[in-house]
Amino acid sequence: MKKLIAANWKMYKTIDEARATGRELVSAVAGSLPADREVLVCPPFTALHALHDTFKDVEGFAIGGQDVYPATEGAYTGEIAPGMLLDAGCGWVLTGHSERRHILGEDDETVARKTAFSLKAGLRVVLCIGEKLDEREAGRLEDVLAHQLQVGLADVDATYVPQSLVVAYEPVWAIGTGKVAGPAEVVEAHALVRSLLEARYGRDGAAIRILYGGSVKPDNAAELLSLDNVDGLLVGGASLQAVSFSRIILA
């Protein structure tokens, strides 16, 4: 399967800024995108339509939502349904991002509902998991990741594996901090995630792509992508500028 290089633009960029960055990115990458790479950009909801227009004729580029609500429609002020994301041109959605877990209080059960509902609606999902620093220091890495996967995938059957499900490992202590998990730490965590997915879904589970996220930058992308069981990257701050993100895509 192709390496997936995903950008999470979080709460940055106006529509015009998103369109300009998207065009710069296409100009920098489209003609030289390796056959084994695909690009996903998750902008703010307001910029989805603009980026869809920018990427619609560019092979290997897709857009996704940063979040979703597990309902078809309803009186859920401020939320967005999977069908609305699809209507805006999205093929993907993020669920369980650490900032939603730890800033907005989303629990594993909420993440599970969003993940299952989105898959059933026809979106592909990047499910984010990862431990906090105190959990790693307490030797609880396996317990934390196993629990997040067990609950987060509780209602996801093998129908969606491996083609529609991606798991992103993002150690919380490395997100936006400038700290990067060392190669041995990344390999350990990704091997653990791979074994847990294989135990749950068998051979197809072992084929689920696992991304690394956490202070990914142009100067560490190639090393991260070379590590065992790293099938792509989830990029935050370094994806906001086309110059730096294009270097990561082509690393």
From Swiss-Prot:
Pathway: Carbohydrate biosynthesis; gluconeogenesis; Carbohydrate degradation; glycolysis; D-glyceraldehyde 3-phosphate from glycerone phosphate: step 1/1. GO terms for molecular function: triose-phosphate isomerase activity. GO terms for cellular component: cytosol. Its EC number is 5.3.1.1. The active site is at H97 (electrophile), E170 (proton acceptor). Its main location: cytoplasm. It is found in: Cytoplasm. Substrate binds at N8, W9, K10, G176, S215, G236, G237. Homodimer. This is Triosephosphate isomerase. It comes from Nitratidesulfovibrio vulgaris (strain ATCC 29579 / DSM 644 / CCUG 34227 / NCIMB 8303 / VKM B-1760 / Hildenborough). The lineage of its organism: Bacteria, Pseudomonadati, Thermodesulfobacteriota, Desulfovibrionia, Desulfovibrionales.
